[in-house]
Amino acid sequence: MCLNTLCAILCFVLTVSFGFVSAQKCGESVFFRPNGNYDTNRRLVLSTLASNVSSQNNRFYNVSVGEGAGRIYALGLCIPGSDPRVCSDCIQLASQGLLQTCPNQTDSFYWTGDNADKTLCFVRYSNNSFFNKMALEPTHAVYNTMRFQGNLTAYTRTWDAFMNFMFTRVGQTRYLADISPRINQEPLSPDLIYALMQCIPGISSEDCETCLGKCVDDYQSCCNGFIGGVVNKPVCYFRWDGYKYYGAFGDEAPSQPPTPLPLPPPPPRDPDGKKISTGVIVAIVVSAVIFVVLVALGLVIWKRRQSYKTLKYHTDDDMTSPQSLQFDFTTIEVATDNFSRNNKLGQGGFGEVYKGMLPNETEIAVKRLSSNSGQGTQEFKNEVVIVAKLQHKNLVRLLGFCIERDEQILVYEFVSNKSLDYFLFDPKMKSQLDWKRRYNIIGGVTRGLLYLHQDSRLTIIHRDIKASNILLDADMNPKIADFGMARNFRVDQTEDQTGRVVGTFGYMPPEYVTHGQFSTKSDVYSFGVLILEIVCGKKNSSFFQMDDSGGNLVTHVWRLWNNDSPLDLIDPAIKESYDNDEVIRCIHIGILCVQETPADRPEMSTIFQMLTNSSITLPVPRPPGFFFRNRPNLDPLTYGSEQGQSSSMSVPFSIDSASITRATPR
């Protein structure tokens, strides 16, 4: 009896020690005006969602409210059969969490997942209808860092078989919580698997199985060998552990009954043959139980501080699970065929880039940093730490890294269509970029920069936005790459200063070149140059020999603008496909971005609104930075060298730009 009590206490202690992190995901780029129709409708829907969900027999409710830009679609659900009051409290908590965490995003969702919760619930809202639609991203994952003890191979076989068994049943019901047969294992390892799978009602059974299958795959790829984990997506949720949770398993018994305990031995006797009193036995047992519980609590507190790792796919403050991101050098060699010339994709800012294939047939891009690249250990760690925190469809995703044999290697997702400059500046290839695609590229880069500057947990300054750092996927959608020069800001920080200016000549703003000052407005300037290049189809440096433009695109465009002839800038390759108003608006936005004074340049959120809302009146632009009125005044530092390559120079802040020393471009 005492043994059973002790086990129950220990199980309770261990259970409450492992709290899962709730998954709040705010929309990436689209925002609404506070106190507008959408905001009013959102608050109305979320204020009534808890009662509406809990009153449904299946604990599921969706609704749409409003018209036009103020229309909102919302959905809430709990575990089927959960107590109405518990469900209502959970939905209310999730709704309040979204209002606080996502104050003006038009598309957000929230899965709860704390052990203190008595159920699992989900809330999502959007300005676009998502009912009955499949969505596999974004992903949120959590795993327990307590490793499995025992025969992992045998346990994994059982785990896989049980998950396959779950798959065969969950597609039709959209919800399943089940317990595996008992497994004979080591004392410190679980002998039961408690698994829960749930999909949003409305998606097909095939989509449900696909989503949950992806969740299981994601868990296995990051966290195999650990005891317990959660992976969730916008339309499905998966969790497994070695104990009950969420009230989902009730008093359900395992498939195989436990082996009965042996009968207790007769009471012990003292040396004189007398029975030891019951009071003495109780005192000894209680003392032992208290001692063991105190030790267990101490271990739990220590373990809890480091037990659960959250893989929010690049949103934590530190590097995301370095162990799961790190590749060994042999794997990289095999994947790239020993860095074969046939697999070389090109030369990046700090080294060569190769295509590779992992054993699971995942295509990768391998960035092998050259020993004399100038990107030392600091830049390498910088890129890994920053990129590992990011997740956005317009940013290249980091898969891992390798530091071995004096090599520094970054492994990225493979983006099939090379970089923007490969198409944009080639006389033959540029025909593949009609105006619709170019306009889409401008919009995608805008969304990516907006995420970096505002929507990610850190404010991140890329510092090297240019055509060669914009990769294109199979559908010509843009992805921002090469974060070796990126810097992150504190929440309350708006600008910084550096004694080592890095970037690409022609894309760097004047305050950065001359004084080393950088902010989000530095990226805005570079983006403005990129917009103008996309419109005209020419490199910034190609204007060095044109008329009296002073050798740069910015001066050339400013003169065309003042002469009321901005359409003279248009690339002949898009003469048959461009939209007159869109082109002029993009040129106008580009000029606003390259204004000399940083305060005059718009924020990326404003640029996004300018691009997506044609009714917004654009301000009159002021003269751009590096505007040259005649060729003799050309700045040799910035425009007398080969442009397009990332470079570095030292900036003594106490003197003016004439004292800047220039280093050889990498």
Curated annotation (Swiss-Prot):
Keywords in alphabetical order: ATP-binding, Glycoprotein, Kinase, Membrane, Nucleotide-binding, Phosphoprotein, Receptor, Repeat, Serine/threonine-protein kinase, Signal, Transferase, Transmembrane, Transmembrane helix
Domain Gnk2-homologous as annotated: residue spans: 24-130, 136-245
Protein name: Putative cysteine-rich receptor-like protein kinase 31
Modified residues (Phosphotyrosine): Y412, Y512
Residue span(s) of domain Protein kinase: 339-616
InterPro entries: GNK2 (IPR002902), GNK2_sf (IPR038408), Kinase-like_dom_sf (IPR011009), Prot_kinase_dom (IPR000719), Protein_kinase_ATP_BS (IPR017441), Ser-Thr/Tyr_kinase_cat_dom (IPR001245), Ser/Thr_kinase_AS (IPR008271)
EC number(s) given by UniProt: 2.7.11.-
Glycosylation sites recorded in the entry for this protein: N52, N62, N104, N127, N151
Family statement drawn from the similarity comment of this UniProt entry: Belongs to the protein kinase superfamily. Ser/Thr protein kinase family. CRK subfamily.
Main location: membrane
Gene this protein is translated from: CRK31
Localization per Swiss-Prot or TrEMBL: Membrane
Positions bound to ATP: L345, G346, Q347, G348, G349, F350, G351, E352, V353, K367
Catalytic EC class: transferase
